[in-house]
Each structure stands twice: as C-alpha cells, then as structure tokens.
Amino acid sequence: MGGGNSLYVAARHQEKIAGLVLVNPMIHIPGMQIKFVHIISRIQKSRASVGDDIKKPGVTEWGYDALPLKGVAQLYKYLKLARTGLPSVKTPTLLFHSVDDHILPVSNTEIIMSELGASQKKRIELVNSFHVATLDYDAEMIFENSRLFIEEHSQ
C-alpha cells in the first residue's frame, strides 16, 4: 500500500519530490468481487489477512490477523484515485518487482510502468524474493540500487 500512497502524493506534490523508489507497489486490486466489497462488507466484517510472503527461511513480517472489509473497500477507491494521477507523475522512478510475488500480480507493475508519465523510469526484477522483498534475499540489492538512485536524483 506504500507504493500506491507514494504515487498518489507524487501526482499532487511533485515539486517536493526528487524521485520515487517503489518495491512491489500496489495500484489496483484485480477481480470482479472487489467491485462489490462495499456491499459484502455489510455482511462479512473481515477476511483473513495476507502477509509473510518471504522466501528466506526464518524471517517473518508482523501483520494483522484479519483485514476489515470496509477498509478494503476504501483501499479500492483510493487506488482508483491514485491510478488516475499516474500520467501526471513526471518524477524519476525506480521500481522493484518480485517475479514470484504471491500477494500482488505483475499487472500492478505493468500498469505503473505503462501509465506513469515519468520519462525516467526503471524496473528491476527481483528473482530471489517474494512480496516482502526488503526482508528477503534481494534486500541488499534493493538497498544498494536505491542508494545509487537517491544519490543520482538528490541534487
């Protein structure tokens, strides 16, 4: 959800942002049932949470036990709003995407890369990490490439 937030802010406050670094960002929730989550949330209050999508043994991520469906409905609306701003985002962007992400489909990365208005955008595929890549095998590569990107764009 941090990627969607970053893109939303970048579309509205580009003058304050020198660059974006996104790791497995979310910009949409695929599937037909998401369109009805606001109705479903009146009947079913929550659903099982997602998390701990980490390839590296022994590493865990703290997360909620359940996701409130009213919150999921708000997230769906928010992501639609964030997506409308993608063409106006001209900020240089570095995007990391885990090839084997069990939480988000690759369509999130594809949408961002195709709809983002930035002329400077780079996608790096992570081949040895799941969704929570900053805690996984590719973490050091993410940190090093991010450091280089930040140095290049913070003048």
What do the predicted segments below correspond to?
Residues 110, 114-132:
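Catalytic histidine neighborhood in serine/cysteine hydrolases
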Residues 102-108:
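Conserved alpha/beta-hydrolase "acid-adjacent" motif
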Residues 68-85:
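Active-site nucleophile elbow and catalytic-triad environment of alpha/beta-hydrolase enzymes
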Residues 88-89, 95-97, 101:
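Short beta-strand/loop motif that positions the catalytic acidic residue
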Residues 9, 21-31:
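Active-site nucleophile loop of the alpha/beta-hydrolase fold
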Residues 8-12, 111:
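Active-site signature of alpha/beta-hydrolase-fold catalytic machinery across serine-
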Residues 127-155:
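Catalytic active-site module of serine/aspartate enzymes centered on a nucleophile-bearing elbow/loop
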Residues 2, 6:
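Gly/Ala-rich beta-loop-alpha elbow adjacent to hydrolase catalytic centers
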